[in-house]
Amino acid sequence: MNCLQNLPRCSVSPLLGFGCIQRDHSSSSSSLKMLISPPIKANDPKSRLVLHAVSESKSSSEMSGVAKDEEKSDEYSQDMTQAMGAVLTYRHELGMNYNFIRPDLIVGSCLQTPEDVDKLRKIGVKTIFCLQQDPDLEYFGVDISSIQAYAKKYSDIQHIRCEIRDFDAFDLRMRLPAVVGTLYKAVKRNGGVTYVHCTAGMGRAPAVALTYMFWVQGYKLMEAHKLLMSKRSCFPKLDAIRNATIDILTGLKRKTVTLTLKDKGFSRVEISGLDIGWGQRIPLTLDKGTGFWILKRELPEGQFEYKYIIDGEWTHNEAEPFIGPNKDGHTNNYAKVVDDPTSVDGTTRERLSSEDPELLEEERSKLIQFLETCSEAEV
């Protein structure tokens, strides 16, 4: 069985033989206190993580660096809140933070120094599963190569990178099958505690952990979500998990969708959203014969929101289906891609698209078979 989505964006640091020398490094000089807001209801979109630190006195140059990190954290938190649709705050300058979701599964923020590897080894972590892309690391100045090199010195821990684009629910959907396949095999191989992280540990990492719990560990989706939210304030994209589940069980079907906008003397028309996320744009082509700007796009099954950008101005097209305004005041167009709803696959998709889908025994077996046969060579 082939993976739905090949995974070239994955790197693995292999475990060494048990005869290698292990080194102990002292912990960071900062004394960190982390306060997390009380657990919230699973359906509360206004999840918030609050961190406080008490550090020893620092030099002026160190304080300058902290100020820059604080500014970057503010910007990142604003972007995250806007993109995720939930009030989320990440303070990179306070160091790595995490929560045990289960005794064998941790969701947390990114490692920042090689010394963080030692901190995780001390709590029994055997697999560090990183979902960050290079731009994520560069933004906060994290040297991933030094962290990977340090982890390779030890026989009892493995560092794995499987990238997912930040703030992109479609990329999450498309990457989940191969990423969770890699995670599944790593857990079987290494045992112990697994540390899943992205940048803040509030979007991609909880989504991957939640999917693993749903597909492999026998949880219903909302049962796993409730447990996750009781341990860590975060905002995983549930629709991406539902769609990735359906993609494996019914096959990844695509259909061509045509979007059109009547020309009114525009110079440039673009679309954002759809399957590319809100941070990217696709230009439309003007058909002078019909007087319409046109975009043809192959999309998998599901509902995709989008917006037009006409000569730099964001708007929606009232001649196409639209929804809103949403809680942020935005009105978006949407394209709904469906196969035959009366078919067996159509019935399965409808059932698993519900608020709290429950996998049948044979469906979970099929998912695990997929994860087992999605070979390392493909990822």
Swiss-Prot record:
PANTHER family (alphabetical): DUAL SPECIFICITY PHOSPHATASE, SUBGROUP, CATALYTIC DOMAIN, PHOSPHOGLUCAN PHOSPHATASE DSP4, CHLOROPLASTIC
Molecular function terms, GO-annotated: amylopectin binding; carbohydrate phosphatase activity; phosphoprotein phosphatase activity; polysaccharide binding
Effect of residue 307 to A: Strongly reduces glucan phosphatase activity. Strongly reduces starch binding efficiency
Miscellaneous comment: Starch binding efficiency is dependent on pH and redox conditions.
Taxonomic placement: Eukaryota, Viridiplantae, Streptophyta, Embryophyta, Tracheophyta
Location of the region described as Polysaccharide binding in the Swiss-Prot/TrEMBL record: 259-335
Transit peptide: 1-54
Keywords: Carbohydrate metabolism, Chloroplast, Hydrolase, Plastid, Protein phosphatase, Transit peptide
Annotated protein name in UniProt: Phosphoglucan phosphatase DSP4, chloroplastic
Role noted for this protein: Starch granule-associated phosphoglucan phosphatase involved in the control of starch accumulation. Acts as a major regulator of the initial steps of starch degradation at the granule surface. Functions during the day by dephosphorylating the night-accumulated phospho-oligosaccharides. Can release phosphate from both the C6 and the C3 positions, but dephosphorylates preferentially the C6 position.
Documented effect of changing residue 140 to W: Changes substrate specificity and enhances glucan dephosphorylation at C3. Leads to preferential glucan dephosphorylation at C6
Main location: plastid
Residue ranges of the region described as Disordered: 54-76, 339-358
